[in-house]
């Protein structure tokens, strides 16, 4: 089973599920105030966040999945020229290593526990609220990945540098230090016996 290691300016984290930023992190973390609603809290807060939609400017840099030997620079250091870079306004950024982030969320249908890659789902700010609703309604079945506004990048490592304020970093459902974060897959880090 693969794990992933994340690094912020102050801390390192291990993970095996997802990293989210943008609307997914906003919904997950801000909906804690209505935890009494159970799983419905995510749906309620997603509607609220779509009505009051936020976009965040960021620089997303990634190494394609073919890069197996990764030497990650410190989060403060420059990246080498083999990293691909996208700078834009985003609604959603979701790096996945598993098919389901929750029982009712088929967020990354093509992920497997040992494929050695992140599947990073990105939605840019050009996506309308109506299109975002259509996409979210298909997350339970995995149909959202067929939507035109849904971009998926397969990579072995990434760095996300928020260029606007107010966003959250969310690893496996928990808030971590905001700001620049980078992650890399640690292939076959755990062996499981059935």
Tell what function each PLM region has.
Residues 99-103:
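A general structural motif
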Residues 1-98:
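Catalytic core of DAGKc-family lipid kinases
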Residues 81, 85-87, 104-194:
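ATP/nucleoside-binding phosphotransfer catalytic cores, i.e., glycine-rich phosphate-binding loops
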